[in-house]
């Protein structure tokens, strides 16, 4: 404690009390304070000073816990205002003081002055002058200090200040509340809005006692998300500080004790509240971490309203500099190159609910485990009979839902992988099986953390670690927050509802059951299925959701190379290209949704048929890739021609199974040409856009899968290398990419540039137009240009009809067409060409009804009479329909046949 002695003017005069200095740490009451010195390598010494010659009211005191019958003592009138007067004036300020008297018990009484010397404000006089304290009776009246106190008291009485005002001062007595009946409700009632408070006591660096205003709740607040070293209570009642506990406590005390603060109440733990303390000079939670006085704690970091990442970053700052509690910190060794730590890969398979198999750019496969999460598992009453074979996917509650969530989100998609840690291999023990080395990573797609999404749906739980274990997800706090939301909302594993049960019949190899199922599957035609496993290029295990069964499925119509087999006493080697065929089938259909046509079954209970994915026949694809040959049984199938064509092309290339093929000379046969009458050749199309002049744009259904694949690859490429906003300068006629209102990128062509804010674009694959700012445009990557795949939207007009020139009538016709065919599949036949676009007839895919004829029947359009001989039959049908509409006075004809006199006025011609 700093001090300075002031000597008297002459050696014979009375001794002048020594003037000492200190910083006010705490105000105990209206007449007592605690001062401290400057810190020197640790918390400084402290000293209690009681003001001489005055008395202030006693503050409230809670009954001792050891006296259950004891009663709480309330504030005396004006006691709290006196304390507040001193607190606001003195806390954290430098004062000087003189000691006038010291009792045998060690209590020190003296005078306190604000500032560095006794010329400063006399605190006792200020209290008395404000009517917040009284002069003690019985003191010597001729003492100058007493005289000044007496004068101050008389002035306060005259001015009716403080306790000399009218009334008994009951309004200054606080209604202190020491306990809260329902802490959770109390926290929620404040809706995380800052609450004014005074910090009354600091237990350790991260736990304080606070007086909440204006309700005067005296509560214990633990700082959310962190923990400082504490003081361990020994059996003899003494306290032993952990390393840096005293320093952390002083750090918090010197900044917050008896300061006005705001507290955001975030949660509760027993009777203690969790919160964040806000002070004008900063956030104590983050400061403690940054200075190495605290560490993050997982159990409460999720409720920290300002973002757990800020706390983790502050902790990292202290760790990297080995500050205080981190002085012995050793960072985990990084044994991965950057290219191995972060990469983009394609998801090929989902393993249960916490791991995936990905294909790297090098072509290698790698198993990735999702960091810090645990898939659903059997617990308690759910543990099954040991004699029954466990099928985890179907028997563990929510395992199937978790796997399906990942499968639908990820299979065939490119994801971003960030390796968080590598879990070393562990040997088996009596209770735990052996584990090989695991690569644990955070996997994201479209900016979404897959592990976090799983946890938020209650389909996985978060692993709890030791506090010093850094081997965890780089987004661990987000996982904890997601789990808290899932628990609160009762999602998945946290639901109180009955767990879903999946009764899946496995009829693989069960001949009797297979015979029972065969007629149903044959009658069903194409059935939906999920490929669960690929045994070889042509042998798969399928899950049929509608029938809730598992079957073994053999591809019909082909001979696929056999793989290696384990036979009794020997291993039979696989045929050439068997592994390539298996890999091809795996990459194409494993865990994909497919359609199957069951034709028959073999004697082992395996079903035989055709498998289609995205409109492609897997048997044909294997033959195309020269990984299979056509089997003679295909002759009686509807797919024989495409199989033969695919095989012939593969033979010509002399690849793989046809590498040694020698073409046999064939006898040339002259084709006989037959004259046939003209017949309409309708092809399936998908209508994407209807224009205001009743033209429409369609996509060819046969090339639809190519467009889907191109769009998927293009968007993955754009998400990996997004265009720099505003870097693209659009030019008329140029192909580009444009971000539509749905937030997705599409191929487009620039039609007109009014300004950078108004660029007219045409979506070349869908036929719609839009005006966009150039910031929503980008350069079309060459890999997705129209050379790779031509524009998929083709413009057509209806043949044999005239579009109304009247705007209202034309709108009626357009609205009708939009309702009937937009975004639907139809059948299209080109009838004749024109300067603008081909004119066609369009049929509904299901009913085969003529769309244009329907418009005529409804009286929405008129017939365009053409003279060509081949059209006379259809023109007659259209004219008959028009006469029926006229007779019924429908739409255009509601006022009769208007064409006789004013056809020109309305823009019609007969």
Curated annotation (Swiss-Prot):
There is a cross-link at residue 513 (Glycyl lysine isopeptide (Lys-Gly) (interchain with G-Cter in SUMO2)). Residues 18-166, 193-328, 341-496, 525-660 form the TNase-like domain. Keywords: Acetylation, Cytoplasm, Endonuclease, Hydrolase, Isopeptide bond, Nuclease, Nucleus, Phosphoprotein, Repeat, Transcription, Transcription regulation, Ubl conjugation. SMART domains: SNc (SM00318), TUDOR (SM00333). It holds the Pfam family SNase. The modification Phosphoserine is found at residues 426, 645, 785, 909. It catalyses: Endonucleolytic cleavage to nucleoside 3'-phosphates and 3'-phosphooligonucleotide end-products. It is found in: Cytoplasm; Nucleus; Melanosome. Residues 729-787 form the Tudor domain. It is an enzyme of class 3 (hydrolase). Its EC number is 3.1.31.1. Phosphorylated by PIM1 in vitro. The modification N-acetylalanine is found at residue 2. GO terms for molecular function: endonuclease activity, active with either ribo- or deoxyribonucleic acids and producing 3'-phosphomonoesters; RISC complex binding; RNA binding; RNA endonuclease activity. This is Staphylococcal nuclease domain-containing protein 1. It comes from Mus musculus (Mouse).
């Amino acid at each position: 404690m700093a001090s300075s002695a002031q000597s008297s003017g002459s050696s014979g005069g009375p001794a002048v009390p020594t003037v000492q200095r200190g910083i006010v740490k705490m105000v105990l009451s209206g007449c007592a304070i605690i001062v401290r010195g400057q810190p020197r390598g640790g918390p400084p010494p402290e000293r209690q000073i009681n003001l001489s010659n005055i008395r202030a009211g006693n503050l409230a005191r809670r009954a001792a816990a050891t006296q259950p019958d004891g009663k709480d003592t309330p504030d005396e009138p004006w006691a709290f205002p006196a304390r507040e007067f001193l607190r606001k004036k003195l806390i954290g300020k430098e004062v000087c003081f003189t000691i006038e008297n010291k009792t045998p018990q060690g209590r020190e009484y003296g005078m306190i002055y604000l500032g560095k010397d006794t010329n400063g404000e006399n605190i006792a006089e200020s209290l008395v002058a404000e009517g917040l304290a009284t002069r003690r009776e019985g003191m010597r009246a001729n003492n100058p200090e007493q005289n000044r106190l007496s004068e101050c008291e008389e002035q306060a009485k005259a001015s009716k200040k403080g306790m000399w005002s009218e009334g008994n001062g009951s309004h200054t007595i606080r209604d202190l509340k020491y306990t809260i009946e329902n802490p959770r409700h109390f926290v929620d009632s404040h809706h995380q809005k800052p609450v004014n408070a005074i910090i009354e006591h600091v237990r350790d660096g991260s736990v304080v006692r606070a007086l909440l205003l204006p309700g005067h709740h005296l509560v214990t607040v633990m700082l959310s998300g962190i923990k400082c070293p504490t003081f361990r209570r020994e059996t003899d009642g003494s306290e032993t500080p952990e390393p840096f506990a005293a320093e952390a406590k002083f750090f918090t005390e010197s900044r917050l004790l008896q300061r006005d603060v705001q507290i955001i109440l975030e949660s509760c733990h027993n009777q203690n509240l969790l919160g964040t303390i806000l002070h004008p000079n900063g956030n104590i939670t983050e400061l403690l971490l940054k200075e190495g006085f605290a560490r993050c704690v997982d159990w409460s970091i999720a409720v920290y309203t300002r973002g757990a990442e800020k706390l983790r970053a502050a902790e990292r700052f202290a760790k990297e500099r080995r500050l205080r509690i981190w002085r012995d910190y050793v960072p985990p060794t990084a044994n991965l190159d950057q290219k191995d730590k972060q990469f983009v890969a394609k998801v090929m398979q989902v393993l249960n609910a916490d791991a995936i198999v990905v294909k790297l750019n090098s072509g290698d496969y790698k198993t990735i485990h999702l960091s810090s999460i645990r898939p659903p598992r059997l617990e308690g009453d759910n543990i099954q009979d040991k004699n029954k074979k466990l099928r985890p996917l179907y028997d563990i509650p929510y395992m199937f839902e978790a796997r399906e969530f990942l499968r639908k989100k990820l299979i065939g998609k490119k994801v971003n992988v960030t390796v968080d840690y590598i879990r070393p291999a562990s040997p088996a023990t009596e209770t735990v099986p052996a584990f090989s080395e695991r690569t644990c990573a955070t996997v994201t797609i479209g900016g979404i953390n897959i592990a976090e999404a799983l946890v938020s749906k209650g389909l996985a739980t978060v692993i709890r670690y030791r506090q010093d274990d850094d081997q965890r997800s780089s987004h661990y706090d987000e996982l904890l927050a997601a789990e808290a939301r899932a628990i609160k909302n009762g999602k998945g594993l946290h639901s109180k509802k009955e767990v879903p049960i999946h009764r899946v019949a496995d009829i693989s190899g069960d001949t009797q059951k297979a015979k029972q199922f065969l007629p149903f599957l044959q009658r069903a035609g194409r059935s939906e299925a999920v490929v669960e496993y690929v045994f070889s290029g042509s042998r798969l295990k399928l899950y049929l959701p509608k029938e809730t069964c598992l079957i073994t499925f053999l591809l019909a119509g082909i001979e696929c190379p056999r793989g290696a087999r384990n036979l009794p006493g020997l291993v039979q080697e696989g045929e050439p290209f068997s592994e390539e065929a298996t890999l091809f089938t795996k990459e194409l259909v494993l865990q994909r949704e497919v359609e199957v046509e069951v034709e028959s079954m073999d004697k082992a209970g395996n079903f035989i048929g055709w498998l289609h994915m995205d409109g492609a026949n897997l048997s044909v694809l294997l033959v195309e890739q020269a990984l299979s040959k056509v089997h003679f049984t295909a002759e009686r199938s509807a797919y024989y021609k495409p199989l033969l064509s695919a095989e012939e092309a593969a033979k010509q290339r002399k690849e793989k199974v046809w590498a040694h093929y020698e073409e046999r000379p064939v006898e040339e046969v002259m084709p006989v040409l037959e004259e046939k009458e003209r017949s309409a050749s309708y092809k399936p199309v998908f209508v994407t856009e209807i224009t205001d002049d009743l033209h429409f744009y369609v996509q060819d259904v046969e090339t639809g899968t190519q467009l889907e694949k191109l769009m998927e690859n293009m968007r993955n490429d754009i998400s990996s290398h997004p265009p720099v906003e505003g870097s693209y300068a659009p030019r008329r006629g140029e192909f580009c990419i444009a971000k539509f209102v749905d937030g997705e990128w599409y191929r487009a062509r620039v039609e007109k540039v009014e300004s950078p804010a108004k660029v007219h674009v045409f979506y070349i694959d869908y036929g719609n137009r839009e005006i966009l700012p150039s910031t929503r445009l980008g350069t079309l990557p060459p890999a997705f240009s129209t050379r790779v795949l031509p524009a998929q939207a083709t413009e057509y007009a209806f043949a044999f009809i005239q579009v109304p020139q009247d705007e209202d009538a034309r709108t009626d016709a357009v609205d009708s067409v939009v309702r009937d065919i937009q975004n639907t599949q139809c059948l299209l036949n080109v009838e004749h060409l024109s300067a603008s676009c081909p004119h066609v007839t369009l049929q509904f895919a299901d009913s085969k009804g003529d769309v244009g004829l329907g418009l005529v029947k409804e009286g929405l359009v008129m017939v365009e009479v053409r003279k060509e001989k081949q059209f006379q039959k259809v023109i007659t049908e259209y004219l008959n329909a028009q006469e029926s509409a006229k007779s019924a006075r429908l739409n255009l004809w509601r006022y009769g046949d208007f064409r006789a006199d004013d056809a020109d006025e309305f823009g019609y011609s007969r």
